[in-house]
């Protein structure tokens, strides 16, 4: 019975990962065919990273038997996708891409969550997530971005969409999956790990000279999803809260993906980034 259950769990996880990779690969084909990736294409690649940083995973359920036990969580799938997409983003623009992921996450936070004590706790937890991001994806991401050339709006949007899984992961929005087995609790990966893998893969495919700005764009897009009144005095890129969120994002993606990102990149003063769509774990 135990062998049957383990085999069934492995088959379920393999099928879910294969479906997510097939869906994501279709959206990234256009970027891979170009020598110089467009901003829209890069942002599309970063969509799993945004989802991973935000951890907006949804639970999966298997309707058989009657006893539910915690098994696969969609967050590990998102984590796998995040690392996968982050690795595909060229090293030159990973830093900016991660920056934008964090800024977009901060934009989505409620006004109550922006209180001083809660903000300090969020920065601490975000810093830990960023540090784990590089280790998790086995891809290098520097803490700060170097000066990079400005990207076009289409290129910025592409980078932002590529990092969607990473944003989902960093925002702790994963939901556990329950599988109804009779009294057999099993600890299994979550879909966020799969999105994490995609995030790292996409980030590694972004040219090195564009990675810093790409991460910046993702963080900015997440930030813009919150009401403007929640961000009074924080819209300028030089604000400490914004800079801190970018720094923590770079640390996480660098550790999780083990991918190179320049130490410092210019502030996105000329950026005009559309909002990132919320990643639900079922699509990129």
Swiss-Prot record:
The keyword Phosphoprotein does not apply. It holds the Pfam family Gliadin. Residues 1-18 form the signal peptide. Contains disulfide bonds. Gene3D superfamilies: Plant lipid-transfer and hydrophobic proteins. GO terms for molecular function: nutrient reservoir activity. It comes from the Eukaryota. Keywords: Disulfide bond, Seed storage protein, Signal, Storage protein. Belongs to the prolamin family. Seed storage protein. Might be integrated via inter-chain disulfide bonds within the glutenin polymer. This is Avenin-like b4. It comes from Triticum aestivum.
């Amino acid at each position: 019975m135990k062998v049957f259950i383990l085999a069934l769990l492995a088959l379920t996880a393999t099928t879910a990962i294969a479906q997510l990779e097939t869906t994501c690969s279709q959206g990234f084909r256009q970027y891979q065919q170009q020598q110089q990736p467009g901003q829209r294409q890069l942002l599309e690649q970063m969509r799993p990273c945004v989802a991973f940083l935000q951890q907006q995973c949804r639970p999966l359920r298997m309707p058989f038997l009657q006893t539910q036990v915690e098994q696969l969580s969609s967050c590990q799938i998102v984590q796998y996708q995040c690392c996968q997409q982050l690795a595909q983003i060229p090293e030159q623009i990973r830093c900016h891409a991660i920056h934008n992921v964090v800024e977009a996450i901060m934009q989505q936070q409620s006004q109550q969550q922006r209180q001083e004590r809660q903000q300090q706790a969020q920065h601490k937890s975000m810093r830990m997530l960023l540090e784990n991001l590089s280790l998790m994806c086995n891809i290098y991401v520097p803490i700060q971005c170097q000066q990079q050339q400005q990207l076009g709006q289409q290129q910025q949007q592409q980078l932002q969409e590529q990092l969607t899984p990473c944003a989902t992961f960093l925002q702790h929005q994963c939901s556990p999956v329950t599988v109804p087995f009779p009294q057999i609790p099993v600890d299994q990966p979550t879909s966020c790990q799969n999105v994490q893998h995609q995030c790292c893969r996409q980030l590694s495919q972004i040219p090195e000279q564009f990675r810093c700005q790409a991460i910046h764009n993702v963080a900015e897009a997440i930030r813009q999803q919150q009401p403007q009144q929640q961000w009074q005095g924080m819209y300028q890129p030089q604000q400490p809260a914004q800079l801190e969120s970018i720094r923590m994002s770079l640390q996480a993606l660098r550790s999780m993906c083990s991918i190179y990102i320049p130490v410092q990149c210019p502030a996105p003063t000329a950026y005009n980034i559309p909002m990132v769509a919320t990643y639900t774990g079922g699509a990129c």
